[in-house]
């Protein structure tokens, strides 16, 4: 099942979102330092340092193609781009309907970073740097573009 297929399935099976949401809500009650990969963690764990990692859609499609994922066997960049667009639309629709929130609103996140031209190490270092500033109550830019 591709990520897009899972998103389409979840549009008609809200019990999956409910289970995930309850797990996220429970994290808000803990004192643990954890990293969560979630489109909605900012909503359910509002005390968190929420980061949105954006990527140019062509870069994202190329990365997926280069990874040669069994679950996403695209035959062309165009096919990958179309699947990414459909997935994003499905997620946006689902979260708007379920929670009344716009996940594309960058104001929902403490920090936004464009990963299109950064290595994974550069992205991790920037996130850690900005997390430390946030933890210390120091100002930092909301968005780090190209």
Residue ranges and their predicted role:
Residues 72-126:
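Small-molecule kinase domains that catalyze NTP-dependent phosphoryl transfer to phosphate-bearing small molecules
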């Amino acid at each position: 099942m591709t990520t897009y297929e899972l998103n389409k399935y979840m549009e008609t099976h809200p019990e999956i979102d409910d289970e995930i949401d309850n797990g996220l809500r429970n994290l808000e009650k803990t004192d643990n330092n954890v990293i969560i990969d979630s489109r909605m963690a900012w909503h359910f764990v509002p005390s968190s340092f929420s980061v949105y990692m954006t990527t140019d859609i062509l870069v994202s499609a190329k990365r997926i193609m280069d990874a040669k994922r069994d679950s996403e066997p695209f035959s062309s960049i165009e096919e990958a781009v179309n699947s990414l667009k459909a997935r994003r639309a499905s997620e946006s629709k689902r979260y708007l309907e379920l929670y009344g929130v716009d996940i594309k609103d960058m104001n929902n996140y403490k920090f936004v970073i464009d990963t299109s031209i950064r290595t994974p190490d550069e992205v991790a270092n920037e996130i850690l740097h900005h997390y430390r500033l946030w933890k210390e109550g120091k100002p930092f830019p909301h968005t780090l573009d190209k």
